[in-house]
């Protein structure tokens, strides 16, 4: 019942549910049959099969009685009905199992037919919605398909990458992680890519992560349209057969015809044959010169003969191709054979469809017709025997077989017969290359090495070969079997240091490297290495080698070719002349080359080299480029690459092809090329030498800093740089105003240093070494500008200091003066150190900003002093010029010559009227100027380094500036110091310090007995020129120092040397001019105790004695700055140490003496040179061999003249100013005198003789005063003893009776000491009433002689208690007068007073005014003693009536004898006083009893 009820329930009410279950089961079964479309893909199929089996076998709850099958069969009709109903709805039938009783045969057939009919839905679900999804046309992608990503992978690893992704997918699925990609595949014909099917790009990145060889970031989405082609099997291949023609699609050979030699279908490549486009010269440069060849124009296609490859024979490798079996010559990754180039290219890179070559192209590929059987027989008959003779030695020499060297001919190793097919020429070269090795033959060995045979090995089985190694030429031993004959037929060329072509027989000089300096004739050239021969060489038979870039071509084909060319000098036409740059007519354009070649008929090889590129000049092929392949006298065989033609032309019909950027050489001597060309604006392309600053920077150009010296001051480099200095820069390192940049330099710019460009051309030419070209020279084109010491003056544009480049405006802040930093006008010191060799810092001036310099350019209306510029230059001021400045205001015809003047040059010995200023030309002489400029100072109120009208004294800054001190620039009442320009309107512009006057010698002018500065005298040397016995300034000499150069044992000017002082250098014993002292004081006030002339403290030896004397300064305590520097030590007033002393910034060891920073051993010299003249005056820094004048800073070998800062070699009277006097009598200025008699100025005198200026006299009656008569009868030296009593010694105690010393007690009767208390009770001259201050306000403590100052004992001041310093009781004549009209000690000391002074203000020494130091007093003053003492210091007096007082410093007096009253005027004056004057101010070498000097 239960069962029945159950069955009823199944058949009845539950029929739907049972049908549904069965229906679902059928679907599930069908789904199990259709696994790809199963709805639950995660359920495995065998579970489905098990469920089906369990279903048909009966369920567990319904098959207990085994009646389940029957129950199911009872339910089938209902299910069938339901299925039929569904079939009626869907139009489809489901697989059912009908009842056996209801199923007949017809119905079964119908069911089977319906089930398996075509297009039936048997394999589909009954209720499937996507019944039409899978059909054959469904391969076309639709929008529903997932995208395909193209991912980059390593080439050749496409399949491996796909497998890795598949493996990763399976491995990750095992751990429950699923890669969100659908499929991945690769295609054979697409290299380097795989294809991944995924919905998102991120999924692809995740899948490819951590897989090597797959670059997922380089991913591209594949377009839908490309998918069918991608999935299509590619069975079509290109059908390319061997021997067909093709054209290259891209690259260098794009469009060229190619012949297919072999095809590899598997590799999709083909071997093609091309006409090569190879640049032989580029290859030569690449392998020979070692430089990377820049990509240039594509060479023309042409066949390459084996002879052209001979140069590269050691680099060529013969290899057999593994694919084709063909043997090729491999050179630089090129495969060459029979003149053709073979390449392996991809089939895609060539186009072989429809290629129709032209006849010319086919002609190039036509094989050579080798019908030469008869030719071979004919040649063998002629040359057969000779060939056997040639071959025999090779067998004896080690069995060199035929073709063992790779072959020379076309056969390329195929034997001698083939080698000789090229004709006689190739055959003969073949014999030569295969012959035995001879001495000095060029051979190759190993792979890339080559060299020259220079000997045979000791064992006899090898050769000694000279080759170029890493560190220079080396000799190696090479076995015979390792050696090969190279292509060494002397036809190769190379480029030298200047890019000039070097050929065989050229003479070259090695400029750098281990063999630097050697010179020889080129014997061999190969791959950038040249082998030279010099008969003077002993090693390796005179042969040596070097790289071509290390050489410099000395000359072209010279004497040898001249013999053949009938005297025509080939050097007149250098390489660049062959192709002039100027747009000349064709006839003129090629004329030089035509002449050269036509005259070179006898020279085998002409001027061309094999392989050189030329251009045809005439004929129908005019303009075509060709290459030289053979040379025979003037016949040149060339090949036209563009037309593949070979013919012979005359050499005059060819022209060299020049690069457009070739720079023409402007060398003075042909062929050297060492002289670099100038640019368009005169800038030299080569590196600057000394005296050239750092390039063309606006601040560079410091004289001793900046550009490094390329050579060790060789004269040629000096000359080159001097030319440049003249043209483009301030000659002393400063830059010339841009408005002056002129490319023109006159032919006579070869003037000496400090010589004019136009008129006075000395012997030194541009090709003469040592000629100082334009220093102090104005270019000829700049007539309107005047230059200072090597400086050019532009109108209203003022240049910089000496070794400072200044701005072009006059309002630039004052750049410190010579050796000092200019302080403000108020006297405030600057704390910065500034030396004379240092770029001066700009400082504010309370009045006006200005820049000054030693050698500063003066504007048209303003003149600068020696090293200073006045920023306030205006036309209203009188142009008093300083030492080193033009005298514009001199109306005198001979108004002041320049120290190395432009017109009357120092080195010319020619006096030019109207020229003044140190190396300055008097361009415009204003009538309102009444005088000539002072030595470094405008005339009015300024002294030598001193400002007039109550200004500071010598070496002292007072209201304006001292020598090397900044001036306010707008002072009217006083001038600046020596090296400073005075703005004040002066009426009596004095002459320059080296001004030559009538009969007098100027400092740096040629005098009767002396030579001029920078002038070559008889037997003398030019300043800046080496003399036979001495050295020039700035030139190295034996025992001398180079100016600005370090020398052994000597110190250079501005250079530190051991134990010696240079100019601007502190020495242990010497002084430095413009150099900071070890004391290192930031300020140099003159009220400090123990300061010397240069402001050095008195703590040192001799109580802080400075170069100019004891520890005193020549200024008052209130003066802010010393003569040298605001901060730091002393400069040109530096302490002079122990014996040996120094000259003006230079030490002089012994009698050899040095000039201004230079020693002169020779006889005659210029400024700072020895003077060979015996009598007369000596020049400044000139040696006087005989008696007479003295030399400033020069040795005086004999006589009574003293040398200023120079040793006095002989005589009892000559003294050197600041130089040791090793003989008696002479005194040295600021130098210790070892021997008795001579004393130095401001130096202790070891012996009893002359005394120094402001120095104690160690010995008795021979002490001389500064400006005192000398012991000998024929002259006095500056600071020399006067034999006769009555004369006073300037700052010297007179051991003997008579005169008193200046600032020194006079033990004997007679004159009183100037600045010293006399025995008669007179007060010291200008002595301070209270306190022990000396002349320079030095305190009395410590030091020698109780703090005695330079010009007096301690406890005395020359400016104490009086309104003026160095003043007598009558206050008429002051050494430094406070009165407005008075002249000071330095007023006229190097200055000519042309205007008469007020009678009460005349300075001592020359009646009304001090005689100009180194100049002559032209105008008579209204003072009475004015007629008696006209002579200036270092000049002659032109007055004829003053016979016994025309003696000047450096000048021989006319009278040889005299007493103190009649004595010859010592330093610039006659001493008339024989008794102490009432005021104790005996004339120091003057005719005025009331004035010193």
From Swiss-Prot:
Localization per Swiss-Prot or TrEMBL: Nucleus; Nucleus, Nucleoplasm
Q: Basic and acidic residues bias located where? A: 24-34, 81-92, 418-432, 586-596, 846-860, 955-1090, 1416-1430
sequence repeats: which residues?
Answer: 732-741, 775-784, 789-797, 818-827, 836-845, 854-863, 866-875, 883-892, 917-926, 935-943, 944-953, 954-962, 963-972, 978-987, 1003-1012, 1013-1022, 1023-1032, 1033-1042, 1043-1052, 1053-1062, 1063-1072, 1073-1082, 1132-1141, 1144-1153, 1156-1165, 1167-1176, 1180-1189, 1192-1201, 1204-1213, 1217-1226, 1229-1238, 1241-1250, 1253-1262, 1266-1275, 1278-1287, 1290-1299, 1302-1311, 1314-1323, 1389-1398, 1433-1442, 1467-1475, 1484-1493
Q: Where is the composition biased (Acidic residues)?
A: 60-80
**What positions does the domain KOW occupy?**
239-266, 501-528, 607-634
Question: MF terms per GO, please?
Answer: chromatin binding; DNA binding; RNA binding
Matching CDD domains, A to Z? KOW_Spt5_1, KOW_Spt5_4, NGN_Euk
Q: Name one GO cellular component term.
A: nucleoplasm
Q: Which UniProt keywords apply?
A: DNA-binding, Nucleus, Repeat, RNA-binding, RNA-mediated gene silencing
- What does the record note on quaternary structure? Interacts with AGO4 via its C-terminal region and with RNA transcripts. Binds chromatin at loci subject to transcriptional silencing downstream of RNA Polymerase V, but independently from the presence of 24-nt siRNA.
Q: What role is this protein assigned?
A: Effector of RNA-directed DNA methylation (RdDM) triggered by small interfering RNAs (siRNAs, 24-nt RNAs). Functions as an adapter protein that binds scaffold transcripts generated by polymerase V and recruits AGO4 and AGO4-bound siRNAs to form an RdDM effector complex. Promotes the expression of 24-nt RNAs. Required for the initial establishment of DNA methylation. Together with AGO4, required for transcriptional gene silencing (TGS) by DNA methylation and repressive histone modifications (H3K9me2) of several chromatin loci.
Q: What is this protein called?
A: Protein RNA-directed DNA methylation 3
Q: Which organism is it from?
A: Arabidopsis thaliana
Q: What is the lineage of its organism?
A: Eukaryota, Viridiplantae, Streptophyta, Embryophyta, Tracheophyta
């Amino acid at each position: 019942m239960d069962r029945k009820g159950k069955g009823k329930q199944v058949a009845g009410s539950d029929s739907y549910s049972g049908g549904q279950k069965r229906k679902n089961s059928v679907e599930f079964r069908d789904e199990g049959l259709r696994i790809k479309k199963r709805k639950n893909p995660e359920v495995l199929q065998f579970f489905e099969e098990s469920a089906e089996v369990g279903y048909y076998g009966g369920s567990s709850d319904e098959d207990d009685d085994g009646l389940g099958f029957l129950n199911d069969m009872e339910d089938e009709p209902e299910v069938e009905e339901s299925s039929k109903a569904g079939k009626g709805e869907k139009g489809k039938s489901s697989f059912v199992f009908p009842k056996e009783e209801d199923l007949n045969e017809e119905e079964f057939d119908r069911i089977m037919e319906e089930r398996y009919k075509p297009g039936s839905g048997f394999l589909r679900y009954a209720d499937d919605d996507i019944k039409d999804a899978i059909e054959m046309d469904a391969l076309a992608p639709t929008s529903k398909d997932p995208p395909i990503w193209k991912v980059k992978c390593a080439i050749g690893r496409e399949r491996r990458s796909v497998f890795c992704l598949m493996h990763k997918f399976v491995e990750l699925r095992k751990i429950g992680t699923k890669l969100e990609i659908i499929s991945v595949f690769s295609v054979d014909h697409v290299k380097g890519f795989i294809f991944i099917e995924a919905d998102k790009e991120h999924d692809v990145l995740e899948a490819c992560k951590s897989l090597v060889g797959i670059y997922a970031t380089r991913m591209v989405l594949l377009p839908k349209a490309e998918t069918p082609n991608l999935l299509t099997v590619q069975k079509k291949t290109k059908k390319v057969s061997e021997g067909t023609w093709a054209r290259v699609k891209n690259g260098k050979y794009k469009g060229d015809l190619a012949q297919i030699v072999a095809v590899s279908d598997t590799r999709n490549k083909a071997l093609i044959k091309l006409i090569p486009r190879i640049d032989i010269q580029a290859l030569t440069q690449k392998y020979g010169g070692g430089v990377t060849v820049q990509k240039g124009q594509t060479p023309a296609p042409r066949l390459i003969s084996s002879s052209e490859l001979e140069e590269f024979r050691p680099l060529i490798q013969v290899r057999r191709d593994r694919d084709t079996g063909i043997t090729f010559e491999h050179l630089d990754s090129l495969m060459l054979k029979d003149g053709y180039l073979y390449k392996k290219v991809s089939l895609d890179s060539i186009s072989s469809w429809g290629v129709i070559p032209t006849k010319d192209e086919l002609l190039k590929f036509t094989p050579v017709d080798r019908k030469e059987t008869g030719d071979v027989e004919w040649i063998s008959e002629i040359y057969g025997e000779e060939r056997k003779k040639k071959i025999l030695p090779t067998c004896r020499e080690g069995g060199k077989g035929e073709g063992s060297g790779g072959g020379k001919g076309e056969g390329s190793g195929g034997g001698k017969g083939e080698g000789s097919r090229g004709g006689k020429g190739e055959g003969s070269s073949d014999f030569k290359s295969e012959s035995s090795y001879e001495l000095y033959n060029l051979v190759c060995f190993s792979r890339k090495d080559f060299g020259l045979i220079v000997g045979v090995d000791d064992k006899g089985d090898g050769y000694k070969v000279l080759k170029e190694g890493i560190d220079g030429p080396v000799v190696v031993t090479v076995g015979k079997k390792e050696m090969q004959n190279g292509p060494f037929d002397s036809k190769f060329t190379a480029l030298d240091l200047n890019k000039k072509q070097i050929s065989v027989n050229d003479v070259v000089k090695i400029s750098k490297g281990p063999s630097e300096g050697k010179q020889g004739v080129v014997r061999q050239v190969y791959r950038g290495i040249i082998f030279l021969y010099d008969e003077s060489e002993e090693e390796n038979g005179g042969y040596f080698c070097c790289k071509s870039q290390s050489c410099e071509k000395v000359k072209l084909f010279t004497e040898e070719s001249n013999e053949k060319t009938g005297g025509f000098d080939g050097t007149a036409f250098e390489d660049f002349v062959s192709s002039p740059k100027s747009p000349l007519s064709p006839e003129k354009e090629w004329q030089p080359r035509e002449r050269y070649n036509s005259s070179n008929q006898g020279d085998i090889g002409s001027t061309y080299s094999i392989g050189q590129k030329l251009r045809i000049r005439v004929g129908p092929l005019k303009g075509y480029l060709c290459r030289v392949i053979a040379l025979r006298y003037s016949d040149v065989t060339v090949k036209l690459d563009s037309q593949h033609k070979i013919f012979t032309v005359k050499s005059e019909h060819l022209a060299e092809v020049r690069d457009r950027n070739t720079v023409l050489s402007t060398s003075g001597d042909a062929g050297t090329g060492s002289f670099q060309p100038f640019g368009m604006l005169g800038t030299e392309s080569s590196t600057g030498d000394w005296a050239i600053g750092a390039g063309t920077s606006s601040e560079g150009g410091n004289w001793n800093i900046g550009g490094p010296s390329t050579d060790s001051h060789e004269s040629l480099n000096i000359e080159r740089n001097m030319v440049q200095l003249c043209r483009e820069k301030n000659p002393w390192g400063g830059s010339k105003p841009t408005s002056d940049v002129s490319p023109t330099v006159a032919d006579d710019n070869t003037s000496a240093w400090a010589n004019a460009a136009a008129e006075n051309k000395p012997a030194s030419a541009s090709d003469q070494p040592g000629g100082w070209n334009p220093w102090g020279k104005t270019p000829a084109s700049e007539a309107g500008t005047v230059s200072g010491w090597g400086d050019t003056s532009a109108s209203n544009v003022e240049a910089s200091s000496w070794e400072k480049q200044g701005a072009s405006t006059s309002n630039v802040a004052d750049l410190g003066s010579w050796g000092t930093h200019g302080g403000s006008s108020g006297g405030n010191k600057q704390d910065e150190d500034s030396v004379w060799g240092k770029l001066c810092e700009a400082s504010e001036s309370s009045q006006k900003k200005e820049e000054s310099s030693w050698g500063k350019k003066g504007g048209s209306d303003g003149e600068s002093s020696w090293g200073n510029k006045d920023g306030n230059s205006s036309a209203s001021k009188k142009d008093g010029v300083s030492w080193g400045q033009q005298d514009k205001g001199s109306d005198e015809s001979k108004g002041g010559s320049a120290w190395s003047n432009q017109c009357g040059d120092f080195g010319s010995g020619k006096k030019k009227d109207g020229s003044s200023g140190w190396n300055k030309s008097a361009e415009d002489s204003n009538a309102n100027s009444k005088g000539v400029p002072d030595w470094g100072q405008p005339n009015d109120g300024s002294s030598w380094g001193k400002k007039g009208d109550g200004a500071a004294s010598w070496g002292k800054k007072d209201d304006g500036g001292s020598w090397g001190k900044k001036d306010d620039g707008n002072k009217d009442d006083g001038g600046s110091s020596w090296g400073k320009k005075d703005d004040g309107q002066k009426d009596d512009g004095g002459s320059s310090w080296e001004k030559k006057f009538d009969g007098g010698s100027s400092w740096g002018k040629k005098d009767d007995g002396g030579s001029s500065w920078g002038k070559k005298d008889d037997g003398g040397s030019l300043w800046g020129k080496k003399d036979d016995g001495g050295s020039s300034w700035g030139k190295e000499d034996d025992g001398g120092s180079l100016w600005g150069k370090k020398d052994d044992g000597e110190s250079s000017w501005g250079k530190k040397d051991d134990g010696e002082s240079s100019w601007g250098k502190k020495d242990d014993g010497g002084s430095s001019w413009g150099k900071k002292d070890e004391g290192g004081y930031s300020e140099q006030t003159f009220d400090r105790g123990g300061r010397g002339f240069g402001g050095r403290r008195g703590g040192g030896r001799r109580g802080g004695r400075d170069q100019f004397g004891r520890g005193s300064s020549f200024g008052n305590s209130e003066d802010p700055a010393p003569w040298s520097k605001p901060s730091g030590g002393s400069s040109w007033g530096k302490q002079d140490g122990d014996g040996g002393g120094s000259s003006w910034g230079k030490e002089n060891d012994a009698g050899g003496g040095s000039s201004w920073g230079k020693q002169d051993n020779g006889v005659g010299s210029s400024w700072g040179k020895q003077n060979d003249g015996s009598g007369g005056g000596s020049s400044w820094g000139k040696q006087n061999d005989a008696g007479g004048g003295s030399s400033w800073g020069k040795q005086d070998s004999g006589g009574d003249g003293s040398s200023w800062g120079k040793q006095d070699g002989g005589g009892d009277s000559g003294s050197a100013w600041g130089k040791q006097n090793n003989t008696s009598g002479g005194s040295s200025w600021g130098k210790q005198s070892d021997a008795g008699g001579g004393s130095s100025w401001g130096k202790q005198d070891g012996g009893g003789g002359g005394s120094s200026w402001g120095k104690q006299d160690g010995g008795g009656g021979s002490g001389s005063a500064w400006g005192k008569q000398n012991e000998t009868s024929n002259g006095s030296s500056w600071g020399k003893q006067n034999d006769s009593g009555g004369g006073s010694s300037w700052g010297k105690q007179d051991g003997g009776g008579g005169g008193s010393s200046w600032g020194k007690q006079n033990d004997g009767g007679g004159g009183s000491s100037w600045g010293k208390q006399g025995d008669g009770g007179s007060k010291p001259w200008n002595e301070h009433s209270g306190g022990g201050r000396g002349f320079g306000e030095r305190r009395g403590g410590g030091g020698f002689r109780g703090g005695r100052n330079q010009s007096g004992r301690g406890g005395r001041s020359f400016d104490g208690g009086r309104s003026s310093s160095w003043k007598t009781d009558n206050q008429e004549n002051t050494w430094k007068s406070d009165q407005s009209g008075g002249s000071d000690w330095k007023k006229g000391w190097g200055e000519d007073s042309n205007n008469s002074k007020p009678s009460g203000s005349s300075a001592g020494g020359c009646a009304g005014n001090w005689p100009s130091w180194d100049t002559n007093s032209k105008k008579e003053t209204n003072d009475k003693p004015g007629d008696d003492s006209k002579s200036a210091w270092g000049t002659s007096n032109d007055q004829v009536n003053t016979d016994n007082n025309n003696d000047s410093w450096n000048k021989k007096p006319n009278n040889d004898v005299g007493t103190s009253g009649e004595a010859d005027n010592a330093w610039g004056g006659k001493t008339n006083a024989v008794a102490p004057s009432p005021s104790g101010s005996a004339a120091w070498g003057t005719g005025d009893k009331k004035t010193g000097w």
